[in-house]
Amino acid sequence: MDFILPELGEGIEEATVSFWMCEKGDKINKNDDVIEMLTDKATFNVPAPVSGVLKDILVKEGDIVKVGQKIAEIE
């Protein structure tokens, strides 16, 4: 399943990856925080949309990601 960056708040179109709270191959549970994102207004923890294994991480720390962009794959 594609893990996309969800809406973070009104008017926020992109955010910077602060850090991943898990690694490729880790088992994750739905609603567990897995990535921290930074904007000019706030810091957001983004939860996993589903339970599974983090198959691939597509963005790294420091990358700027747009809302709706695929950031990882969950299997």
State what each model feature region is:
Residues 1-37, 45-51, 55-58:
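Acidic, low-complexity mobile loops and tails
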Residues 42-44, 70:
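Flexible, nucleotide-binding loop/lid elements of kinase catalytic cores
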